C-alpha cells in the first residue's frame, strides 16, 4: 500500500510539474504572439512561430509530408504570415523556412561562405561524420570532386551505358519468373547492385545480397522516428550501418593485402589518396551507396506509377521507345545517341523528379549573422531551403499536383532553371544527377518495351523524410508481345 501511495505521489508531482511548465510556456506564447512580429521586425527576422515545446512544428510538418498534399505545411504558413519565408521550429532547432526560389538560390550558392550544411543529429548518426552531407570545407570539396570525376560524362557514355543495360536486362529476366513483384523493393536492389559494382567492384553475388538486406534496415531507419531503443527501426538501422562499415573496412584490408589484383572502382581511387583515412573512406563509400541508389530507385518506381495513372503519357512513351527499337532492328544495346534522342522520356523524367520530390530540401546553418533579401538571420540559426515547395507551387506550375510531362516540352534544358532543383545546387549539387537520369531513361526503355503490367494496389506516396510507397507498388507483369 505504501508503495502504491509513493507511486501516486511521484505521478502527481510529475503531472503538476508538467502542467506548470505548460502554463509557463502558454503564457510566454501568448506574449510572444502579441509581440513576435514586432520583435522579428526589430531583428529583421521573418514572421513565424516556434510551436509546441520541444517538438516545435515538427508534427505539423510530418503530417503534411505524409499526406497527399505535401505542400500543406507551407501553404498554411504562407497564408498566415503573408510570406514565403518564415520562422519555425523543426527537429529540435529554430529555423528559417523558405519556399522562395530566389532566397533558396542564394542559400545554395553561398555554401561555405555564409552557410554550412546542418542536418538533425539522428540522421547524421546514420550518415556518419564523413558522409558528403556531414563534411565541410576542403574535405567536402575534395570528396565531392572525386565523386564528380567518377561520374563524368565520358564514363557515363562508355562505361555506364553498357553496365546499366546489362544489369537491367538480367534483373528483368528474374522478374519474368516471379510474375508479381513489389517494384519499389526490386528497383532498390537493382540500383544498389549497380552502385556496388561502380564503388566496390562487386558483381551480384551472396555478398551483394547481404549488403542489400542490410540496406533495407539502414534505409528504413532514415525514414523512421529516431527512437534509439532495442528493437526499434532506428536502432536496427544503426546496427546495419555498423555491419556495412565493417564490410567496407574488410574490403579495404583485403585490397591492401592483395595489391596485385586490379580493380576499376572508386575504392581503388580513394586508396591512392594518402590524405584520406580509412574512416573517411568507409563513411564516404556508405553515403554514396545510399544516395546513389535512393534517388534512382525511387524515381524508377514513381515514374512507372505516374505513367500507370496517365495512359496518354504511357502511349507516347511506348511510341518513342518502339521507334528506337524499330530503328535498331530489335532489342539491341542502346548507344549514347539513342539516349539523347529520347525527348519525351526526358519530359517524363523531369516531371517525375518535380512531382516525386526525391530531395525535399536542404538544411543549412548560418556561419555568421547573414542578410538575405530583407531578412537578417542570426548566427547559428538553421535555414531550411524547401526546394520541393517550389516544385509544387501553383504560381510556377499550373495544376502542380497533376502529372503532366508535356509541360516540359518547351523547357527541356533545366540546368539554369531555379524553379527546378531536384538535385540541390551550389557547391553540394548532387554529383550523380546525370547518372540518375541515365539510369532512369534506360530502365524505362527496357521495362516499357518488354512488359505490360497491372498495378495491384492504389496508394498515395508519403514524403517524410523521403518519398516512398508503403506497399512498394505491387504489380503483375506480362511479357509484351
Swiss-Prot record:
GO cellular component: membrane
Amino acids binding heme: 430
Keywords: Heme, Iron, Membrane, Metal-binding, Monooxygenase, Oxidoreductase, Transmembrane, Transmembrane helix
Catalytic activity: abieta-7,13-dien-18-ol + 2 reduced [NADPH--hemoprotein reductase] + 2 O2 = abieta-7,13-dien-18-oate + 2 oxidized [NADPH--hemoprotein reductase] + 3 H2O + 3 H(+)
Transmembrane segments: 2-22
Tissue spec: Expressed in young tissues such as flushing buds and green bark tissues. Lower levels in mature needles and bark.
InterPro entries: Cyt_P450, Cyt_P450_CS, Cyt_P450_E_grp-I, Cyt_P450_sf
PROSITE patterns per the UniProt record, alphabetical: CYTOCHROME_P450
Induction trigger: By methyl jasmonate.
Top-level taxon in the UniProt lineage: Eukaryota
Entry annotated with the keyword Cytoplasm: no
Record-linked Pfam families: p450
pH-activity note: Optimum pH is7.5-7.6.
Signal peptide start-end: none
Gene Ontology process terms (BP): brassinosteroid biosynthetic process; brassinosteroid homeostasis; sterol metabolic process
EC nos: 1.14.14.145
UniProt membrane topology term: Single-pass membrane protein
EC class: oxidoreductase
PANTHER family noted in UniProt: CYTOCHROME P450 26, CYTOCHROME P450 SUPERFAMILY PROTEIN
Role summary: Multifunctional and multisubstrate cytochrome P450 that oxidizes the respective carbon 18 of abietadienol, abietadienal, levopimaradienol, isopimara-7,15-dienol, isopimara-7,15-dienal, dehydroabietadienol, and dehydroabietadienal.
Protein's name according to its UniProt entry: Abietadienol/abietadienal oxidase
Gene: CYP720B1
Amino acid at each position: 500500500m505504501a508503495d502504491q501511495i509513493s507511486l501516486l505521489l511521484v505521478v502527481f508531482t510529475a503531472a503538476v510539474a508538467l502542467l506548470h511548465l505548460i502554463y509557463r510556456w502558454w503564457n510566454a506564447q501568448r506574449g510572444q504572439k502579441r509581440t513576435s512580429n514586432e520583435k522579428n521586425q526589430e531583428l529583421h527576422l521573418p514572421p513565424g512561430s516556434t510551436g509546441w515545446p520541444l517538438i516545435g512544428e515538427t508534427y505539423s510538418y510530418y503530417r503534411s509530408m505524409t499526406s497527399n498534399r505535401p505542400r500543406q505545411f507551407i501553404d498554411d504558413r504562407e497564408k498566415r504570415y503573408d510570406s514565403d519565408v518564415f520562422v519555425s521550429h523543426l527537429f529540435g532547432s529554430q529555423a528559417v523556412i523558405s519556399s522562395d526560389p530566389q532566397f533558396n538560390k542564394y542559400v545554395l550558392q553561398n555554401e561555405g561562405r555564409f552557410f554550412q550544411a546542418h542536418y538533425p543529429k539522428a540522421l547524421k548518426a546514420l550518415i556518419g561524420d564523413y558522409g558528403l552531407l556531414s563534411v565541410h570545407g576542403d574535405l567536402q570539396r575534395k570528396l565531392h570532386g572525386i565523386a564528380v570525376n567518377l561520374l563524368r560524362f565520358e564514363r557515363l557514355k562508355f562505361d555506364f551505358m553498357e553496365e546499366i543495360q546489362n544489369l537491367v536486362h538480367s534483373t528483368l529476366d528474374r522478374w519474368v519468373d516471379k510474375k508479381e513483384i513489389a517494384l519499389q523493393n526490386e528497383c532498390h536492389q537493382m540500383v544498389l547492385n549497380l552502385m556496388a559494382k561502380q564503388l566496390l567492384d562487386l558483381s551480384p553475388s551472396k555478398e551483394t545480397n547481404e549488403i542489400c538486406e542490410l540496406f533495407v534496415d539502414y534505409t528504413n531507419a532514415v525514414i523512421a522516428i529516431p527512437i534509439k531503443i532495442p528493437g526499434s527501426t532506428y536502432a536496427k538501422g544503426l546496427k546495419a550501418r555498423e555491419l556495412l562499415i565493417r564490410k567496407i573496412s574488410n574490403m579495404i584490408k583485403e585490397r591492401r593485402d592483395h595489391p596485385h589484383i586490379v580493380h576499376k572502382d572508386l575504392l581503388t581511387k580513394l586508396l591512392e589518396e594518402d590524405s584520406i583515412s580509412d574512416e573517411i573512406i568507409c563513411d564516404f563509400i556508405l553515403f554514396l551507396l545510399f544516395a546513389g541508389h535512393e534517388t534512382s530507385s525511387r524515381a524508377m518506381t514513381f515514374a512507372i506509377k505516374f505513367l500507370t495513372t496517365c495512359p496518354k503519357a504511357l502511349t507516347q512513351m511506348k511510341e518513342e521507345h518502339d521507334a528506337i527499337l524499330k530503328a535498331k532492328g530489335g532489342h539491341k544495346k542502346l548507344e549514347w545517341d539513342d539516349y539523347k534522342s529520347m525527348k519525351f522520356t526526358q519530359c517524363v523524367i523531369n516531371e517525375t523528379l518535380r512531382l516525386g520530390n526525391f530531395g525535399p530540401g536542404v538544411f543549412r546553418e548560418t556561419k555568421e549573422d547573414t542578410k538575405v533579401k530583407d531578412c537578417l538571420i542570426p548566427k547559428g540559426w538553421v535555414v531550411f531551403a524547401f526546394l520541393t515547395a517550389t516544385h509544387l507551387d501553383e504560381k510556377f506550375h499550373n495544376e502542380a499536383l497533376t502529372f503532366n510531362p508535356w509541360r516540359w516540352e518547351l523547357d527541356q534544358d533545366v540546368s539554369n532553371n531555379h524553379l527546378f532543383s531536384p538535385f540541390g545546387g551550389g557547391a553540394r549539387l548532387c554529383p550523380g544527377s546525370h547518372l540518375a537520369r541515365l539510369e532512369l531513361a534506360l530502365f524505362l526503355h527496357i521495362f516499357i518495351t518488354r512488359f505490360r503490367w497491372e498495378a495491384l494496389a492504389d496508394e498515395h506516396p508519403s514524403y517524410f523524410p523521403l518519398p516512398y510507397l508503403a506497399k512498394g507498388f505491387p504489380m503483375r507483369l506480362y511479357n509484351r508481345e
